[in-house]
UniProtKB/Swiss-Prot annotation:
Note on how the cofactor is bound: Binds 3 Mg(2+) ions per subunit.
Catalysed conversion reaction: (2E,6E)-farnesyl diphosphate + H2O = valerianol + diphosphate
Keyword Metal-binding listed: yes
Name recorded for this polypeptide: Valerianol synthase TPS8
Essential cofactor(s): Mg(2+)
Positions contributing to Mg(2+) 3 binding: 452, 456, 460
The organism's place on the tree of life at top rank: Eukaryota
GO MF term list: carbon-oxygen lyase activity, acting on phosphates; magnesium ion binding; terpene synthase activity
Entry note about domains: The Asp-Asp-Xaa-Xaa-Asp/Glu (DDXXD/E) motif is important for the catalytic activity, presumably through binding to Mg(2+).
Amino acid sequence: MASSQVGDMVNGNAEPTRHLAKFPPSLWGDRFTSFTLDKQLWDKYGNEIEVLKEQVRSMVVAGGRKAAEQINLINVLERLGVSYHFEKEIEEQLEQLFAKFEDNEDYDLFTIALHFRIFRQHGYKMSCDVFNKFRDSNGEFKETVSNDVQGMLSLYEATYLKIRGEGFLDEAHAFTIAQLESLVGGPHLSSDLSEQVMHALKQSIHRGFPRLEAKHFISFYEKDASRNETLLRLAKLDFNQLQLSHREELCHIFRWWKELDLISKVPYARDRAVECFFWSTCAYYEPQHSVGRAVLTKIMLLLSVTDDTYDAYGTYDELKLYTNAVQRWDVSAMDELPDYMKALYRALLNVYDEVERDLAKQGRDYGVHHSKEAFKEIVRSYEIEAEWFKEGYVASFEEYMKNALVTSTGRLHTTSCFMGLEADVATTEAFEWILTKPKMVAASGAIGRLVDDVMSHDEEQERGHVATGLDCYMKQHGVSKQEAIVELYKMIENAWRDINEEMLKPTAISMKLLIRVLNLSRISDVVYKYVDGYTHPEIIKDHVISLFEDPIPM
């Protein structure tokens, strides 16, 4: 997102030239200003949820079920969005299932691919060799595969768990997409199955926003003749109760942002309180992480305005002053800043003080220092891009990416996200791990940076913008824009492969932490899939309404 425009003072006193972005305004008005939680409805949902949870827990741990049936139950729980209630029981079951798995079982493609996806999602490195029996002597898929729509759909979803060196999964990905696309809307698919296929082709399970995907799956599962009514009821109640919590939290955040009144002082910036909360809810949606969602949202909002200050308003001289002030992190530095920057700087210091006080009450404020240092690092990199723009410099792609992996916010978002987790999960060692520049955090940052570079390129260049990764690659390699886009998407796919590999056991840190990095990567896939949905929030408006406003009919 970040780069810069500049404009030097003309004749000493004239207003400097500013390359204003004219970002779209907030969509929401006062829509989320007030919300009263219906405590009676909340309690009603909660009481029934507790009863159903115990029934489902008994189902998960019950013996006598075949392995294929058990893996399918786990899959349904995950896709319905209720597996977080049974994490311990599911992990115990998967450990046993993986240890006993035999690929010589007479499993069909759907079942094999389902095992592969679920095991990989939980860190178990199942080999691609399990798919060999579906290929002929020439290595091509057998004709029977093309006739198995459910099997192809299951394989398609499994291919998103690929790591580097797994060429078969690349082939399977291309094959299943081609086959499924040819079947959509045709006479061989029921309308319900066709709808599932179309949604899967638009948004894979592995890269989707977990809560949104759960809501989609609930609507599909409701039409499944083999559905389990207990699971369906639990999923609906759980979604609706959690939606009430999220809506109440969003109301608090929205009011806080309005009272802060920062946008009135920096009207050039994007006003995106709702979208930042949406982003934070992807990082962690579970009810116990309400503090984390608030912390992450507030820091993201400050970063967004800071980004726009460097990207679409501040002059180079002003930006140098602001960079120095952030490095000092002291209220006395405010005296050197222009008035509009004083408002932003004051908000930055105050919000971090507020966050530190809130986390100190729970004994987990030790991560705040790491978040501050990450913020300082990003601002330094923003200034580098401002200088590049001022000089008209087009960096080599390697030089660009070295700086872009900082401005991609991977370290800051990961650090700030970890601050909202339990102290026994987000330990001091976890924050020290981030400082080692781990491959997974770098990969997550690369995904966000490169997909944003592609999706926002034309608009940013039109108003005046530092050379993006797309520009740097085109110049260095002498290729067209379309050729460069193809290469950047190859890099994005490799970054996803790295994320998948880093989540295979044994992992460097707890899976409870790694899943947050994965979730931060997922939001890039959702928000920037077709256009920059953060800058143009109408693109994700339906997602926001679905997640925070529209309950599931009971």
